[in-house]
């Protein structure tokens, strides 16, 4: 299955122009199997997203994009978000003890909000985006190289704030994702890989990229 793991919805992300229903319509049009809403410092969409999933049969998971002192991290499985800014390690520890996971968002983006080379050494980091929709290609390539050095595959996410951005990059999971726990397990076990949307379908990265599903 294929999920876009990084999307902002306008209710709780003031810089987003897109609502949940139109996000889902676009996601379905592009062939996504599910989406993750990751608003800035908020998981306020959780209840509505759960209801939408039950009513419409389209998986909508909710995490949050949290700015730490070292950079942005997508957290999932953390019901109560911190009320104040934390160091990345403290946020990851908080997620871990609550059964959640942390994914570094756009680690090499040149905006002062990426973890950079810390993705290579930060304990507790489950994955990181190697294909990020709002990140320039050379900086995504740095993330890809870091993943190769670590023997990991990494994630893909659009970081969509506009409708046309939804699904530009996404994450492939070889296993069925039918619950939040399925998603958390797949991320934790590195059973995922980045994909990009091209000519009407999603494609895995080729070349020297390594996959570790089996």
Model regions and ranges:
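Short, conserved beta-strand segments within well-ordered enzyme catalytic domains
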Residues: 36, 59-61
């Amino acid at each position: 299955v294929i999920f876009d793991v990084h999307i902002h919805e306008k209710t709780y992300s003031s810089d987003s122009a897109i609502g949940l229903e139109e996000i889902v319509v676009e996601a379905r049009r592009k062939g996504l199997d599910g989406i993750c809403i990751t608003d800035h410092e908020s998981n306020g969409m959780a209840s509505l997203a759960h209801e939408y999933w039950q009513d419409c049969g389209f998986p909508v998971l909710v995490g949050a994009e949290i700015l730490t002192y070292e950079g942005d991290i997508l957290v999932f499985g953390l019901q109560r978000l911190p009320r104040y800014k934390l160091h990345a390690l403290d946020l990851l520890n908080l997620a871990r003890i609550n059964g959640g996971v942390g994914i570094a968002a756009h680690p090499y983006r040149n905006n002062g909000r990426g973890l950079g080379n810390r993705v290579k050494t930060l304990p507790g980091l489950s994955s990181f985006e190697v294909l990020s929709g709002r990140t320039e290609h050379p900086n995504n390539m740095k993330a890809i190289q870091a993943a190769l050095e670590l023997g990991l595959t990494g994630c893909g996410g659009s970081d969509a704030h506009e409708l046309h951005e939804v699904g530009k990059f996404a994450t492939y999971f070889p296993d069925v994702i039918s619950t939040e726990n399925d998603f958390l397990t797949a991320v934790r076990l590195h059973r995922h890989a980045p994909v990009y949307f091209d000519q009407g379908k999603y494609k895995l990265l080729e070349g020297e990229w390594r996959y570790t599903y089996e």
